[in-house]
UniProtKB/Swiss-Prot annotation:
Key words, A-Z: Cytoplasm, Leucine-rich repeat, Repeat, Ubl conjugation pathway
Gene3D superfamilies assigned: 1.20.1280.50, Ribonuclease Inhibitor
GO cellular component, one term: SCF ubiquitin ligase complex
This protein's name: F-box and leucine-rich protein 22
InterPro entries: F-box-like_dom_sf (IPR036047), F-box_dom (IPR001810), F-box_LRR-repeat (IPR050648), Leu-rich_rpt_Cys-con_subtyp (IPR006553), LRR_dom_sf (IPR032675)
Pfam family, one: F-box-like
């Protein structure tokens, strides 16, 4: 029996065992399999292990998406986490190649995936409060938001959770240095039923703008403490 003789349900089941690249390669072999690849039912979950994967065309964003994770574990994450005013020209150049990738991708998610229930972002040093606030507004069924080592996340994201995260049951903001203890207290008071975890976040040194002639020395001490 040829694979194209299988019914739609069997083909979807077969595709479900393949990774994104394998699904795309198989879909290229004939229009029938391409049609299966483009079936939203095949894509309830997406996991990305690097930012470059976000630029590929080997997946589908649709209202069927329920779970999304972007986990970037790379030495370049440390560069992204450095405050902009402390970065060298080389470091700024490195960041310029990918700094908008996650935000741009999440904006697409906001437009196409209103039924999203779970989001995990790890090592996404350029994701912004504004982007996360929009995600909360556009995905009203979001129940779990896990943020780890996202340097630009601040108390504004906590405020957005209180305002727009009506369905949110779990929030993790681990190793997010610009989230403060005061911001966490306000969120706990506003959302007492929310399961909130903030491992090390409030204890880390937050971003500071350079002040006065001694700023470079302070900046060096801060880098050494990280």
């Amino acid at each position: 029996m040829h694979i194209t003789q299988l019914n739609r349900e069997c083909l979807l089941h077969l595709f479900s065992f393949l990774d994104k690249d394998s699904r795309k390669n198989l879909a290229r072999t004939c229009p029938q399999l391409q049609d299966v690849f483009e079936d939203p039912a095949l894509w309830p979950l997406l996991h990305f292990r690097s930012l470059t994967e976000l630029k590929k065309d080997n997946f589908l964003l649709s209202p069927a998406l329920r779970s999304l994770s972007i986990c970037w574990h790379s030495s370049r994450v440390q560069v992204c986490s450095i405050e902009d005013w402390l970065k060298s020209a080389l470091q700024r150049n490195i960041c310029s190649r990918h700094e908008s990738l996650v935000n741009d991708f999440l904006l697409q998610v906001c437009d196409r995936c209103p039924n999203l229930a779970s989001v995990t972002l790890s090592g996404c040093g350029h994701v912004t409060d504004d982007c996360l606030a929009r995600l909360l507004r556009c995905c009203p069924r979001l129940r779990a938001l896990h943020l780890e080592n996202c340097a630009r996340v601040t108390n504004r994201t906590l405020t957005a959770v209180a305002a727009h995260g009506r369905a949110l049951q779990t929030l993790h903001v681990d190793f997010c240095r610009n989230v403060s203890a005061a911001g966490l207290r306000r969120l706990r008071a506003a959302c007492p039923r929310l399961t909130l975890r903030a491992e090390h976040s409030a204890a880390m040194i937050p971003d500071q703008l350079p002040r006065g002639p001694h700023a470079p020395g302070a900046a060096l001490r801060k880098l050494l403490l990280r």
